[in-house]
């Protein structure tokens, strides 16, 4: 009678051990399958909250990086337009120097003026047509804010149409004594505008590096918290399988032993 009772007491313990092994096997199998140490809140309540926060920061940084890349592209387009205009103005300077040659006749000067007028028309076209996503970049003064994380970078666009007109560039008489002054003033103005866009792009590049570093660090931290240690998970899975097999064997032996006792008692 005492032996039967011991068997009855041991059987629940074996069942409990088997259940624990089953649960651990299920957990480790899920970790191996998903590659994640945390698959539900109950796995690590504190860890999952930290992981969620890191994921949010990574996603916010991704949005910021897209904004920064758009801003950088905008600055590059503007600088490309200014570079094209500057090349044309440099050609105007060369033509103006030629026009100062006292050996030229009127026909020569008219030919040079025609070349200058064509260059000026091209400059005005470039000023009006340089744009990004439908926004004109060179003929309207305004501030374009690029939001990235908690901060923002401002790109200032110039009104080159009026600024160059104020320099007398678009009414340029290539043979006049003050033509070079107008041209040199225009070149200085263009250099300032190009420098402003280059400065904004440098700021955006710095922000991009900062956001990228932050995202990498956050991703590594999240990985340490959430990712499964595959070697450890595989080892624990093997251990759980062995424990499960042992529990099943012990349960079978306990059931067989109980059956023998009951058979003896029934005689």
Question: What is the predicted role of each segment?
Answer:
Residues 1-23, 33, 37-40, 48-52, ...:
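Amphipathic alpha-helical coiled-coil/heptad-repeat segments
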Residues 43:
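Short beta-strand/loop segment that forms part of the nucleotide-sugar
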Residues 230-236:
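Surface-exposed loop/turn positions within long extracellular repeat scaffolds
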Residues 28-29:
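N-terminal signal-anchor/start-transfer transmembrane helix
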Residues 217:
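C-terminal catalytic core of tyrosine-transesterase DNA break-rejoin enzymes
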